[in-house]
């Protein structure tokens, strides 16, 4: 009985500790290289001071809920922030549903075999990473927690 209780406790600990692990991003450090297989309709977002990459799946209700808010922030800070919606889905499956999100500041990228998800250590979606022009991470977390106040703080931060 003690052995069973020990095993159940160990499994419960592993499950909770795994879900609490941080992603593979260290603020102030370079973000990993993105392995983009292709861009939806070959459209990449215009250059901006900051890039927000959202790790996304078109069937995820959480992703669908967060995307309009992030797009609104991108539009509010015109020219300061662009958005890359990154998915591991096939072009044929996700392309149709994601086409509506394309704009000068928003692009949809298809990950090459999940390599970018792996490089970033993504353990949940929608996960966001914001990095500057030089590729240094300035913010990361759940897409739901990214808002205008957060981006205002990013804009006031001066890199030395």
Task: Put a short name on every predicted segment.
Residues 1-5:
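Positively charged n-region of N-terminal signal peptides that target proteins for export
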Residues 6-16:
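Bacterial N-terminal signal peptides
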Residues 20-44:
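N-terminal "domain-start" segment that seeds a small globular fold
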Residues 43-64:
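Short active-site neighborhood of thiol/selenol oxidoreductases, capturing the structured segment around
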Residues 54, 83-85, 130:
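Structural beta-sheet core signal
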Residues 64-101, 113-116:
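Structural microenvironment flanking redox-active thiols in thiol-disulfide oxidoreductases
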Residues 82, 106-107:
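Conserved beta-strand segments of alpha/beta enzyme cores
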Residues 100-103, 113-155:
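Thiol/disulfide oxidoreductase modules built on the thioredoxin-like
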